[in-house]
Amino acid sequence: MRECISIHVGQAGVQIGNACWELYCLEHGIQPDGQMPSDKTIGGGDDSFNTFFSETGAGKHVPRAVFVDLEPTVIDEVRTGTYRQLFHPEQLITGKEDAANNYARGHYTIGKEIIDLVLDRIRKLADQCTGLQGFLVFHSFGGGTGSGFTSLLMERLSVDYGKKSKLEFSIYPAPQVSTAVVEPYNSILTTHTTLEHSDCAFMVDNEAIYDICRRNLDIERPTYTNLNRLISQIVSSITASLRFDGALNVDLTEFQTNLVPYPRIHFPLATYAPVISAEKAYHEQLSVSEITNACFEPANQMVKCDPRHGKYMACCLLYRGDVVPKDVNAAIATIKTKRSIQFVDWCPTGFKVGINYQPPTVVPGGDLAKVQRAVCMLSNTTAIAEAWARLDHKFDLMYAKRAFVHWYVGEGMEEGEFSEAREDMAALEKDYEEVGVDSVEGEGEEEGEEY
């Protein structure tokens, strides 16, 4: 069995975790108390959903997940919420004082007091797995726990589980819903530390999600619940192939194989369609070609950047619902002729396609309409470097004045770590630039013959 363990760190990670597990339970027909009426094999079995849920002898399904936060209030909501019976109390780990939006507190001072307990709980979950394939880590870049503690955890996971894949779902800070002035510092410090430990990181830009909620779902003032429900749909689409019998991307390593050309270039761009409110869904026919086209609209991306200015290195289309290969092939053929999709010249312009026949599920009372089919596109494009450039610029503005740095130094960091992290980010931007540059040999002859 190829199990995945989800680790939800900090407030953002935990709240996205809530949305995701709520959706998984609906998709698999698991009740809030963990019972699953449709499951015939009690106490185990080799069903696909067992990658995410373990079964007890009493027929209860328990998420293979750990929730960690350095302060208790957010996880207390899980402990008292609808799904309180779903989780084992030991899976919900809280500290006493928070990281106060300070990477150094999350990584050094406060984080180190709780890390061993967390690793111990992860070890217990890992022991229940017959063939653990890896970890999904959910966190934000901006918070102290999300940035500092995650990077500490990733370092330790690399030591304890060297060969296992680690995928991240990271929330990229947005100006609209900013919670701290020091988000650029935390983001760059955490990216620098986790870069070599993470195999694949799906970034989600709060601003992009915010705009999608406003534009496509007509929510004037989106709340975190709106954002998280949308994010959970995307996470669910990406992990559907792991939880249902799918044909493509059946395990985590396959994501890397398909999307990561070089170890550092591991930030695929996710795009999801259709995002549509129930009122509108009645009047629109969302065919395979329409939703496929929508994936190439920058407006539907999870990170604000423009792929038309970048080049693609890889492209995966994950369909779910009522989709047949014939329609998909037609849709892709149309896109190849119409769209100005530029692949790097050292990479074949193939689209990898996965179809999962389980239609998308929606949370009752949520914002999204129930649709027959949906698609999630994962593409590795050089355009995502724009996101790093924006962040680096904000970092530079503050760091030039050494603003707020004393809070980090006071928690035992050294100023050198800032410049080291910033240099690493500059190198990352450079890497993206170089990947997009055409290789030298075949220059003259094949310029006009890309497509």
UniProtKB/Swiss-Prot annotation:
Please tell me where Mg(2+) binds in this chain. E71
Q: Where in the cell is it found?
A: Cytoplasm, Cytoskeleton
Name the coenzymes or cofactors required.
Mg(2+)
What family is it from? Belongs to the tubulin family.
Q: What is its EC number?
A: 3.6.5.-
Keywords, alphabetical:
Acetylation, Cytoplasm, Cytoskeleton, GTP-binding, Hydrolase, Isopeptide bond, Magnesium, Metal-binding, Microtubule, Nucleotide-binding
Q: Where is this site: Involved in polymerization?
A: Y451
Q: Which SMART domains match?
A: Tubulin, Tubulin_C
Primary location class: cytoplasm
The protein's annotated catalytic reaction(s) are: GTP + H2O = GDP + phosphate + H(+)
This chain belongs to the protein called Tubulin alpha chain
On modification after translation, the UniProt record reads: Some glutamate residues at the C-terminus are polyglycylated, resulting in polyglycine chains on the gamma-carboxyl group. Glycylation is mainly limited to tubulin incorporated into axonemes (cilia and flagella) whereas glutamylation is prevalent in neuronal cells, centrioles, axonemes, and the mitotic spindle. Both modifications can coexist on the same protein on adjacent residues, and lowering polyglycylation levels increases polyglutamylation, and reciprocally. The precise function of polyglycylation is still unclear. Some glutamate residues at the C-terminus are polyglutamylated, resulting in polyglutamate chains on the gamma-carboxyl group. Polyglutamylation plays a key role in microtubule severing by spastin (SPAST). SPAST preferentially recognizes and acts on microtubules decorated with short polyglutamate tails: severing activity by SPAST increases as the number of glutamates per tubulin rises from one to eight, but decreases beyond this glutamylation threshold.
Motif: MREC motif; annotated at 1-4
Q: How does it assemble?
A: Dimer of alpha and beta chains. A typical microtubule is a hollow water-filled tube with an outer diameter of 25 nm and an inner diameter of 15 nM. Alpha-beta heterodimers associate head-to-tail to form protofilaments running lengthwise along the microtubule wall with the beta-tubulin subunit facing the microtubule plus end conferring a structural polarity. Microtubules usually have 13 protofilaments but different protofilament numbers can be found in some organisms and specialized cells.
Keyword Zinc-finger assigned to the entry: answer is no
The Swiss-Prot or TrEMBL note on domains reads:
The MREC motif may be critical for tubulin autoregulation.
Residues that hold GTP according to the record: Q11, E71, S140, G144, T145, T179, N206, N228
Q: Which residues carry this modification: N6-acetyllysine?
A: K40
Return the annotated region ranges for Disordered: 432-451
Name any Gene Ontology BP term: microtubule-based process
